[in-house]
Regions:
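Conserved ABC ATPase signature
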Residues: 158-162, 166, 433-437, 441
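ABC ATPase C-loop
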Residues: 175-176, 450-451
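Hydrophobic anchor residue at the start of the ABC signature
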Residues: 172, 447
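Helix-to-loop junction immediately C-terminal to a conserved catalytic motif
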Residues: 75, 345
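Conserved ABC ATPase "signature" region
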Residues: 136-154, 411-429
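Catalytic Walker B motif of ABC-type/P-loop ATPase nucleotide-binding domains
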Residues: 183-187, 458-462
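ABC ATPase NBD Q-loop/coupling interface
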Residues: 87-100, 349, 354-374
Length: 499
């Protein structure tokens, strides 16, 4: 069963190949809660909730408040007793979500995580094949679903050649083809450029209008989905803090929502962060050595990047990155930004051209040729997928890995861990397993693990995704402090406020 395209239990037959239409699903929670295994406190508790068939609901809340846990519960993906403990009841159409997956479809944050097969048509057909849909129905449904989400590519088009927005629409088409009555959207635009956000938003609206499905969307920002939803539920401190029509909740609790970290329309966080530090004159030296803002730390010359020399992603890249300066790299999904970041960090060899890094201690050259010991303390990388970085059983142990490898004692490491936990709002999670954190918490931990090793050059791939207003400010201030210490920052981002 494909959890990325989460739906099961065979839908009704449709002789003309149209996706079968029916009533939206009904959602009911009574005293429901969830506690992750190994955690002392529940993520959610005492949740009472009714969502009528066809309702469109926006779920808001600060990072780590339990929004994604609620979505996982509704999708039947939280697991059994070994994963955690549930209390109360949570049902979809009167049955436990795990028994109603044919009525539930889940669209997640990461476009890459939801592509299953190599060709577009096969990917949409995959879920229906698992459900036992008649073969003569599958391909008409594939075509109808792709048309509904506005993805006009040949059925044999390679899924690897799709942009992030196209991959999200492909995942949505795969869900639509299975005919769910409940559509769950867990920050589906978090990793997309502005055009991708618009594409997915329009596709969701079309799907909802055609199917009458019940919609529950989790998002940190109100403005993306405000015109689609008719109700908002605010989750905070492990419980429901507000529930009602969107305009009414915003009017009555706007200030309280902002205090809880919700991004409201018109918010300008740049004023709270303050202006970026000016590059000092050429005589000003950064702590790591070299004239900050005038001495290159990295030179890229005629670079070709990619995973296969026969199909390069980008070529002819020339770039100079100045020491002690923050550089943001922007562009459309699929433009090769993440591939460039991996090449810059020495984790992917150049297909052609050169990457030259000059460190303060004279360790120069292409970082791809450096040993792990040479990379430590000189360069760090924050991956787009935080889970790729996690090695330890607890958050505190994760933060200790880099300093310990650098030869620091436990007495030296402990205050560093406390400092980073507090700065990023993770203190209460010090003993938690990193894999049980929310998406936003994982992102902040991944940034902290990179910063705590005190690198000269820090490369970040989408450093602010999944953050509420408050945690965004904390993360940006931490990076600003690193910049003022002389750390060179290179960030891949779609976040205009961060730029």
């Amino acid at each position: 069963m494909d959890e990325a395209h989460s739906a099961s239990s065979r839908p009704a037959s449709s002789p003309d190949g149209q996706v079968p239409l029916g009533e939206g699903a009904r959602v009911c929670a009574r005293g429901w809660g969830w506690r992750h295994a190994g955690r002392k406190n529940a993520v959610l508790s005492g949740v009472d909730l009714d969502i009528a068939p066809g309702e469109r609901v926006l779920v808001l809340g600060p990072s780590g408040s339990g929004k994604s846990t609620l979505m996982g519960g509704l999708a039947g993906l939280l697991g059994g007793a070994e994963e955690g403990d549930a209390t109360g009841t949570l049902t979809v159409d009167g049955v436990a979500p795990a028994e109603a997956r044919g009525r539930v479809g889940l669209l997640m944050q990461d476009p890459e995580a939801q592509v299953v097969l190599a060709r577009v048509g096969d990917d949409v057909a995959f879920g229906m094949e698992n459900l036992g849909v008649a073969r003569e129905e599958i391909w008409p449904r594939v075509e109808n679903s792709l048309e509904a989400v506005g993805l006009s590519v040949p059925l044999d088009h390679s899924t690897t050649e799709l942009s992030g927005g196209q991959k999200q629409r492909l995942a949505l088409a795969s869900i639509l083809a299975m005919g769910p009555g409940l559509l769950l959207l867990d920050e589906p635009t978090a990793n997309l450029d502005p055009s991708g956000v618009a594409e997915v938003r329009a596709a969701v609206e079309t799907v909802v209008e055609r199917t009458g499905a019940t919609v529950v969307v989790v998002e940190h920002r109100v403005d993306v989905w405000a015109s689609l939803v008719d109700r908002v539920i605010v989750v905070a401190d492990g419980a429901i803090a507000a529930d009602g029509p969107l305009d009414e909740v915003l009017a009555q609790q706007g200030d309280a929502l902002r205090e809880r970290g919700i991004w409201l329309p018109g918010d300008d966080v740049a004023a709270e962060v303050g202006p970026a530090p000016k590059v000092p004159p050429a005589s000003s030296e950064s702590p790591e050595g070299g004239a900050r803002g005038t001495t290159p730390i990295t030179r890229v010359t005629d670079l070709t990047i990619g995973y296969d020399a026969s199909a390069p992603v980008r070529s002819g890249i020339d770039l100079t990155i100045e020491r002690g300066v923050s550089t943001c790299i922007v562009g459309a999904n699929g433009a090769g930004k993440s591939t460039f970041a991996l090449t810059l960090a020495g984790l992917l060899p150049p297909l052609a051209g050169t990457v030259e890094v000059e460190t303060a201690d004279g360790t120069d050259g292409d970082p791809h040729e450096w040993s792990s010991k040479q990379l430590l303390g000189r360069m760090s990388m924050v991956f787009q997928e935080p889970e790729y970085q996690f090695l330890a059983a607890t958050v505190a142990e994760e933060l200790a890995i880099g300093p310990r490898a650098a030869g620091m004692t436990d007495e030296e490491i402990a205050p560093l861990i406390d400092e980073h936990l507090e700065a990023l709002g993770l203190t209460k999670l010090a003993r938690a397993n990193p894999m049980t954190l929310s998406g936003g918490e994982k992102r902040r931990l991944s940034v902290a693990t990179a910063l705590i090793s005190a690198p000269e050059l820090l490369i970040l791939d989408e450093p602010t995704f999944g953050q509420d207003r408050g945690t965004w400010l904390g993360l940006v201030r931490l990076l600003r402090a690193a910049l003022e210490r002389g750390v060179t920052l290179v960030s891949i981002t779609h976040d205009p406020a961060f730029v």
